[in-house]
Design a protein with these regions (language model features):
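Charge-rich, acidic-biased intrinsically disordered regions
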Residues: 64-82, 243, 250, 300-327
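Nuclease catalytic cores
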Residues: 5-55, 279, 283, 311, ...
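Short, amphipathic alpha-helical segments that act as regulatory/interfacial helices
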Residues: 47-51, 178, 296
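Mg2+/Mn2+-dependent nuclease catalytic core
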Residues: 79, 86, 118-230
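Short, charged, low-complexity amphipathic alpha-helix
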Residues: 195, 218-287, 389-400
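A non-catalytic, helix-rich entry segment at domain boundaries
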Residues: 38, 42-126, 211
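Alpha-helix N-cap/helix-initiation motif
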Residues: 32, 165-167, 274
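Extended, charge-rich alpha-helical segments
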Residues: 290-400
């Protein structure tokens, strides 16, 4: 649900169950956005429209393109709106819609139809709002899809990223969604079996975990509930580990820094590692890389705000020259009597380094000098003794 975030969100449950105090600190941090988050949000909205249309219109399976031609309901109009939003974000709607439809929507819909054949009262909930307060203080969340029927609750989670495969077995996020469904929309049903499925269509991967109503409830009461209470109060100990990789406060967390430093100091020379130690260190690399990236991002943010970071500054990064008007450049080269075969690499001009070899430096400047631009390099961190001048942060946008 855009705009609303629980202090103890299901998606971060592995983190706050492992490291309870991190939740309260993360709640004070601004939400981070990225192109990947925008893409993921659009993918989920496309999936929601498609799956809702299949359910409400009782459609036969078709293609993602065919759904744009459906005259009933608002599915075509809704998808065209999302098509426009993808275009504005520089994203390929056809690729996203086709992947989500074939890899996720049809899977859920076909399983829903199988449930209906066994139990005509089966329900399919799409983007189901779940009240989790029985187990998590002020807890709520949304499950991408929930099927309730045939004495079973089946919960689905679409993950559109293509980074790492996620296992559904004993996955706390999925178990929390299942608890929310069992003690919410399915509260009036007799439920024996619980099924949890993570679908990652871009990795052609899905993972499924099945348990019983009794097993899930026991975990909710005796594992989740006390862990959530501790995290909500900000109590417990900081406990670093692989879960730090996605923590927004990792860059300023002394415990995470100490853990990372201890790893580096313990295993300084890889050539001295035993095979079992090498395997352990490999398992920690994602954490170390993630922590280092967060530290760099935080330092960059502070310096761009004009705040000092001991021993560091922002300088202009490497920039590449380019020709601003390819057509005009080609016409000038023709007029200068240059053999175009020596300067063209279909369908455009060769790079400037290759052009310099043909025209020599002075010829390049004479013919094309005013068409050559060199944009400002991307800001990058550098030590204070770096010979490049420090960039002056533009803080004017803070007052707009």
């Amino acid at each position: 649900m855009p705009g609303a975030h629980a202090i103890l969100s299901p998606s971060a449950s592995k983190r706050w169950m492992e490291c309870p105090p991190s939740a309260r600190r993360e709640a004070l941090m601004p939400e981070e956005s990225s192109p990947y988050a925008v893409e993921g949000s659009l993918a989920h909205r496309i999936a929601e429209v498609m799956l809702t249309a299949y359910r409400d219109l009782d459609l036969l399976p078709m293609t993602a393109d065919d759904l744009l031609q459906v005259e009933e309901g608002t599915v075509a109009a809704d998808l065209r709106q999302l098509q426009q939003e993808c275009s504005e974000a520089g994203l390929d709607y056809d690729s996203i819609a086709g992947t989500v439809h074939d890899g996720y929507v049809l899977l859920v819909y076909e399983e829903y139809q199988a449930f209906r054949r066994a139990d005509k009262d089966t329900r399919l909930l799409v983007e189901a709002r779940l009240n989790l307060k029985s187990f998590i203080p002020e807890g709520f969340g949304s499950s991408d899809a929930v099927i309730i029927g045939n004495d079973t609750v089946s919960v689905y989670d679409l993950k559109f990223g293509k980074g790492i495969k996620v296992d559904a077995v004993n996955n706390p996020q999925m178990m929390i969604y299942a608890l929310g469904a069992v003690y919410g929309p399915a509260d009036d049903y007799v439920v024996h079996d619980i099924r949890m499925t993570i679908v990652q269509p871009r990795l052609a991967w899905y993972s499924r975990f099945e348990t019983t109503f009794e097993g899930l409830t026991h975990w909710g009461k005796y594992t989740l509930r006390p862990a959530a209470a501790k995290a909500f109060e900000g109590a417990g100990e900081y406990r670093p580990g692989p879960h730090c990789r996605f923590c927004r406060v990792a860059s300023s967390c002394r415990v995470c820094e100490a853990y990372s430093r201890a790893l580096r100091e313990t295993f300084q020379d890889p050539s001295d590692l035993r095979d079992d130690e090498l395997g352990y260190v490999l398992g920690q690399l994602d954490l170390l890389r993630g922590w280092a990236a967060k530290v760099e991002t935080r330092a960059m943010d502070l310096l761009q705000q004009g705040k000092p970071v001991g021993g560091w500054k922002i300088v202009e990064g490497r920039s590449v020259r380019k020709i601003s008007d390819q057509d005009a450049a080609i016409e000038r080269l023709k007029a200068a009597g240059i053999d175009l075969d020596t300067v063209l690499k279909a369908p455009e001009l060769k790079g400037l380094t290759d052009l310099e070899k043909v025209l020599r430096k002075s010829g390049l400047q004479t013919i094309l000098g005013d068409l050559i631009t060199k944009p400002q390099g991307k800001p990058t961190l550098a030590r204070e003794d770096d010979p490049r001048p420090a960039m002056t942060p533009d803080v004017s946008k803070d007052f707009e």
